[in-house]
């Protein structure tokens, strides 16, 4: 497997969240970063990409900048945009890091509700009443083809470009930055799982 980072959390247990990350068997370095703040109800999983440790740096920037922006009053989408701009600026300042980026998924709790935001193919799943449901939608070439009816679900699972993303923090593509967003409410015994695509 590729590198994988994951965090899961619950609204109703005393042990609110836990996380694990692993570089996988193909890489020597782990480019995933995690931020877990049970007290403020904020969790981030970022999966970096890019040479010269660029992915490691990009994911670390995301996990530092997003909580910082939110602590200063930014909304969740603005926090992702600020992290994106910081990663792009770092790549401009250090040419060896140009092209680095990171997928990201964020959960921010607000009382009995929470909001999620993401860019790329890191995912969030909700476990509720015995069912695991994906809440995020990948920003990927294959997902676009699936939505437009060019691929079936089965074809998408085995497509050779299934891991080619269409957006991430740090991307300077003409398509620009895509951010997905949803709100939901906690129900009894709900769990959320945030993970990189390596899981």
Question: Residue ranges of each PLM-predicted region?
Answer:
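PP2C/PPM-type serine/threonine phosphatase catalytic domain
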Residues: 2-199
């Amino acid at each position: 497997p590729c590198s994988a980072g994951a965090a899961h959390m619950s609204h109703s247990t005393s042990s609110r969240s836990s996380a694990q990350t692993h570089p996988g068997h193909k890489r020597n370095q782990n480019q995933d970063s995690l931020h877990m703040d049970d007290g403020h109800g904020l969790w981030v999983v970022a999966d970096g990409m890019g040479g010269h440790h660029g992915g490691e740096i990009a994911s670390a920037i995301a996990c530092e900048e997003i909580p910082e922006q939110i602590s200063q009053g930014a909304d969740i989408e603005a926090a992702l945009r600020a992290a994106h701009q910081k990663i792009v600026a770092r790549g401009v300042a250090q040419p060896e890091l140009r092209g680095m980026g990171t997928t990201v998924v964020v959960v921010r709790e607000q009382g009995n509700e929470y909001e999620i935001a993401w860019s790329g193919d890191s995912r969030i799943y909700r476990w509720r009443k015995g069912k695991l449901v994906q809440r995020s939608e990948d920003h990927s070439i294959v997902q676009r083809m699936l939505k437009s009816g060019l691929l079936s679900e089965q074809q998408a699972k085995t497509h050779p470009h299934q891991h080619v993303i269409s957006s991430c923090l740090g991307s300077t593509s003409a398509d620009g930055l895509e951010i997905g967003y949803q709100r939901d409410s906690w129900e009894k015994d709900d769990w959320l799982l945030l993970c990189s695509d390596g899981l």
